[in-house]
Amino acid sequence: MVDDSNYLTPHETALAVVATAMKKARLQLDTLLINSILGGVLFSSGSFLLVAVYSEDPDIVARNPGIVNLITGVNFAMGLFYVVMMGADLFNSNILFFSVGVLRKAVTIYDLMISWVVSWLGNIAGSLFVSYLFGHLSGISSQKLWIIGSRQIIEQKVSYSFVQTFLKGIACNFFVCLAIYLQLMAKPIHVKFILMSFPIIDFIGIGFTHVVGDMSASFIAMLNGANVSVGKYIWKLLIPASLGNIVGGLFFSAVVPFYLHLVVVERDRKRLSLPEYEARDEQPELNMDSRVVRIQKNECDDDATETGEDLENLTEKGFASIYNTNHDNSSYFTGRSLNSLRSIPSSVITSDNVTMESDLGEPVQFIPKSNSTTRSPHLGLPHNLPHNHSIKSINRHRINKRHSLRSPPGVFPVRGMGEPLEREKTIEDATYDPKENELFLRRAETHNSAYVKNKKKEDDNLLRLVKTEEDREQKEYEKNGGYNILENKPGTRLEKIITHLAENVSSREVTPPILPRTTQDTFPHNAPASSPAYTDDAHSLRKANSTTLGGLFRAVSKEFHSSKDAESPDDLLKKMAAVGINRNARITANNVAGIVNLNKEDLDSTTRRQKITEPKNFYNRHTSPQL
């Protein structure tokens, strides 16, 4: 199956799911919304046919409902086929793509949230648009039989409990994801339709619940006056079916593509040292599912030349025009005329290792007019290119120039482009270890001179340098003019918004009050360098307090105290004596603090009448004059 270009192996199909998820993650919101509305419009064709079959021949429904279920299964398969071929977005299929993508770490949870929410809302909008405009207003769904049939359909669906609808939704999307997965394995269009038809017929015939498939039928019935309110439809059908489809899609995605076809296969290949392949996406364009193929590593460079096969069909005249365009023939060829050049057999010209030598005469010597490197308008090659290049080597020269452009970050490795970045290599092959990359090891030794000497920290350094190398490659790609997909996709914007909101909420939290620092805390006599006043925590605390309104008010107002007219030192001494402070204590207070530092509010307190006794053999040594 590997050699057949029309089919893919399960491992290649699982990688195609990952590549498609990365492709859908870079869709802008307007494109994603339009794709989702289109998906609802296209898939509603199955719902319209469901109502038509059940309404216009009620006798068959009553006598042989199995035939009706088989027919409606084919109808929904047609709707899914339209969605896949047009590259539209369906909520149920996006569950498959982004679940595997998140498990593979190819996309983020923010990409998943945007895709699921927008596609879900877009499918609702598209289904409602078709049901109202082309169903109700056109009068098609207002026919008597359609009114009766549509009412019966939705009233039967909402008759189940929440849990019953939830369980039916789980089984339904398991089959839908299986249908999407099977069609990825085939390239012919008719085979795609056949493969996706079987699972769709299964879940329709059994009676499972598809949230998008039931939308148009439910809207038609409610517009026809069914005994179902909008709230009842949302609670009994829309919500349980959506949740069930999510669970069923997650289960299929985690078990089949991710675990069985990616983890198990790659783990076994590494254990047995099986031949290694490079996986490349040959359909990287938007609005279409990816197609991942495997090629051997030594074939990656030669693969780029396949796109230049049209150049190999050039005639000898076209080949000769490379050398004589806008110039005189005699200026380029000596010893041989241009006719002798044209007489060289084509088999000789198209050989890989051929030179312009033959048995017809002396070798042709190329003599350029000047050292100009003006490019030929035909092939874009310099005129001073040596003549011994064959057409195939010229093709390789041009294609390899394009091939040297690395596969962009955030995109699954593209066939025909250069080597992907480190992050994309790990997405392509989970067993790839950047630490084993020879080029990476050389750069690691350059960045860290102690890398080889300190074996104990070797692994930690490598893990750190892996991220450094990935960032370096991405910056180098952007510097060369590459488009940064990772910074411009909607999921990244959503992540930045949520992070910004979280930071604002955390910054609004009130800082718990702390006691003022003492002189000993600020300037410890035994270790001044370890003072908390000079630590980062103290600096950040002072900065935080200074940026708040309360902190600014405290900083400005702490130097001011309410007071009346200035008092003389005699008045202060009298108040000190009135509260019981003796003369020697008053003198000591004057020597230690000074009169200007006395606070009269402390002296006014009548509760502080504690008598200060005079220390013995201490104040006799003071010679300060009495006040």
Swiss-Prot record:
Q: Which GO terms describe its molecular function?
A: high-affinity secondary active nitrite transmembrane transporter activity; molecular sensor activity
- List where Basic and acidic residues composition bias occurs: 605-614
Return the annotated region ranges for Disordered. Answer: 512-537, 605-627
Q: Does the keyword Hydrolase apply?
A: no
**One GO CC term on file:** plasma membrane
Highest rank taxon of the organism: Eukaryota
User: What UniProt keywords are attached to this protein's entry?
Assistant: Membrane, Phosphoprotein, Transmembrane, Transmembrane helix, Transport
What is the recorded name of this protein?
A: Uncharacterized transporter YHL008C
Provenance organism: Saccharomyces cerevisiae (strain ATCC 204508 / S288c)
